[in-house]
């Protein structure tokens, strides 16, 4: 039994050329797609909580997490320009390490993307309910309360996930337009917050107790805000729907990371400059800070923008989950029915299946620590991609690359070390959930995937 059999690069490139998906994405579409995935619940929810943990030194938390992700982004850019496949991390590992490792990380990433989308949907529901309450419209609490707490479920979260799934089922042209509009709204409210908030900054809020919890607090916050960077890897899952992917993908990945890191740092500087850090442990910190300085109307606009903007995050993560699942199924490791496309060149069965699963998770399960699985899955995936870049550097030195990681192999090694440091602070509960999910995936692999693999 050869569970470490590998796909050839030539076969993957041939699959990419014989596209059943429709290529419509350009560099700017990819940048907006990436921003839509990254700037979401992270900047709207986590910045306040991380600031409460690390104080004004939270900017270093974002820099540490951002540096690790930027190094991984360079590795993604090289691999995406070399092997433009919707399988992303899964495909890179299939070539470099072998089938069972590729399948396992693909399985984990599917779970991670679905859980992240469900988590963002929960955040959207909270903002939506708060926005309606501000307009004098009260949704009965039982309609956004989980059954375990005496409610009917998070109905707004279910509805928004199904609506976005419907948009995705209409093809990338429709979903691209909707995503671009939502991202414009999201970026607009972040810029509005920075421009308005900067006039209320008190520098003494930065200098007094700059790092209240020391370096450990900065690292703890770095692990927390890592969630805020999830999404840049989703760009590479759109490879087979991208025009000229060898050039567009690396450009989009790098531009997206630079823009998002700059936004995060500016938002944190304004947050901790306007209000003392120990008052920022709220889930709607941006609106809270604006209300504290009497900018209630601007706070309302920010809440409205959050409702619109978080939808882009849900769309991006469901899309990424669909594309990775599609590629795994195309290789025979999941049922072939999942690869059937409709008249819009969309795998409709897969799209609706993953969308309904996300809706059920968002509506009826207390995600809580389950959402941390997305962090672990992504950290391990990013570390493996950094490792794979080194493998490609050694095994395929002459292969055509649209982009090369500078300073090989030093930068990928630094990336792996940084991700190892982030994994060190992951809780035991999260590790148990992760291992259980991997075991379930391996049961599926040995029961179905191995014998149905296109590689014999």
Protein language model regions, located:
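Membrane-helix boundary/coupling elements in multi-pass transport proteins
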Residues: 44, 85, 108-126, 224, ...
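TM-loop-TM module centered on a large, flexible mid-protein loop between adjacent transmembrane helices
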Residues: 91-92, 98, 129-134, 221, ...
């Amino acid at each position: 039994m050869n569970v470490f059999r590998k796909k050839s690069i030539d076969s993957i490139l041939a699959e990419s050329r014989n596209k059943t998906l429709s290529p419509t994405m350009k560099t700017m579409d990819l940048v907006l797609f990436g921003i839509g995935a990254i700037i979401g619940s992270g900047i709207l929810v986590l910045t306040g909580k991380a600031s409460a943990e690390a104080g004004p030194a939270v900017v270093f938390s974002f820099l540490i997490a951002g540096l690790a992700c930027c190094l991984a982004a360079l590795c993604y850019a090289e691999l995406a320009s070399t092997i433009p496949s919707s399988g992303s991390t899964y495909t890179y590992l299939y070539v470099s390490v072998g089938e069972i490792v590729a399948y396992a990380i693909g399985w984990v990433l599917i779970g991670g993307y679905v859980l992240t989308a469900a988590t963002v949907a929960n955040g959207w529901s909270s903002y939506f309910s708060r926005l309606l309450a501000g307009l004098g419209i009260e949704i009965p609490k039982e309609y956004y309360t989980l059954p375990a707490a005496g409610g009917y479920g998070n109905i707004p979260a279910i509805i928004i996930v199904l609506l976005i799934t419907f948009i995705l089922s209409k093809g990338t042209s429709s979903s691209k337009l909707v995503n671009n509009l939502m991202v414009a709204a999201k970026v607009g409210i972040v810029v509005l917050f920075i421009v308005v908030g900067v006039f209320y900054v008190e520098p003494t809020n930065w200098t007094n107790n700059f790092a209240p919890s020391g370096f450990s607090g900065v690292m703890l916050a770095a692990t927390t805000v890592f969630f805020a960077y999830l999404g840049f890897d989703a760009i590479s899952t759109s490879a087979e729907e991208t025009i000229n992917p060898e050039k567009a993908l690396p450009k989009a990945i790098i531009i997206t990371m630079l823009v998002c890191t700059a936004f995060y740092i500016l938002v944190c500087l304004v947050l901790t400059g306007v209000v003392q850090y120990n008052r920022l442990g709220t889930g709607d910190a941006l609106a809270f800070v604006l209300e504290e300085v009497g900018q209630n109307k601007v706070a309302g606009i920010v809440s409205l923008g959050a409702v619109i903007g978080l939808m882009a995050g849900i769309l991006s993560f469901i899309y990424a989950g669909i594309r990775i699942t599609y590629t795994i199924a195309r290789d025979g490791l999941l049922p072939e029915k999942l690869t059937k496309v409709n008249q819009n060149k969309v795998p409709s069965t897969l799209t609706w299946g993953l969308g309904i699963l996300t809706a059920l998770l968002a509506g009826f399960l207390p995600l809580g620590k389950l959402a941390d699985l997305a962090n672990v899955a992504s950290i391990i995936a990013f570390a493996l991609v950094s490792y794979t870049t080194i493998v490609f550097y050694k095994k395929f030195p002459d292969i055509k690359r649209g982009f090369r990681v500078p300073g090989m192999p030093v930068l990928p090694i630094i990336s792996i070390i940084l991700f190892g440091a982030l994994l060190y602070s992951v809780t035991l509960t999260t590790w148990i959930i992760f291992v259980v999910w991997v075991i379930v995936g391996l049961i599926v692999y040995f029961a179905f995937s191995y014998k149905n693999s296109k590689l014999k």
